[in-house]
Amino acid sequence: MARVALVTGGTRGIGAAISKALKAAGYNVAASYAGNDAAAEKFKAENGIPVYKWDVASFDACAAGVKKVETELGPIDVLVNNAGITRDTAFHKMTLEQWNAVINTNLGSLFNMTRQVIEGMRARKFGRIISISSINGQKGQFGQVNYSAAKAGDIGFTKALAIENAKGGITVNVIAPGYINTEM
């Protein structure tokens, strides 16, 4: 029986590439998305990967979404925290809404999603959690104080969670890509 992998933001850009690669490697893949229904349906039709719509910035939406995926596909063995947004502007022009949207989606979603799957992984003594950060989480970027802060937080979250679960058969890693020409 194939292991189940869930990729957030898994229907476009980096997430779509990850979803397709996991399917090619033999995983039973689910891809979540937040807003572009047409792109998600096209992705599903072209790749045969089921898609699920929810907002990763909402804990309750993540709980309901994960429950639906696990009911339909089985327990999630691999979680790829990939969903992300930008609301770029210089800090002195940044609104609280721009700050919160990016922090809640790009960092808060790691808690929201991982919290839904970690207990099952611990019980099964197996799990893989991979979070997609960014080079800008390591060096910062003009106009991306919110994004850089969130992506730096992703790195800290991952390191701490890895330590907590190292002896339980769960690996937790972060990938910090450089600049990639893809929409977010």
Predicted features along the sequence, with ranges:
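Alpha-helical segment proximal to the catalytic Tyr-Lys
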Residues: 119, 163-164
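Active-site helix of classical SDR
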Residues: 114, 150, 158
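Active-site loop immediately N-terminal to the catalytic Tyr-X3-Lys motif
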Residues: 92, 139-145, 167-168
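Substrate-binding pocket helix/loop in short-chain dehydrogenase/reductase
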Residues: 90-91, 98-103, 129
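The beta1-alpha1 cofactor-binding region of Rossmann-like NAD(H)/NADP(H)-dependent oxidoreductases
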Residues: 54-65, 96
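Conserved glycine-rich cofactor-binding loop
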Residues: 11-12
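Residue(s) in the substrate-gating loop at a strand-loop-helix junction
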Residues: 134
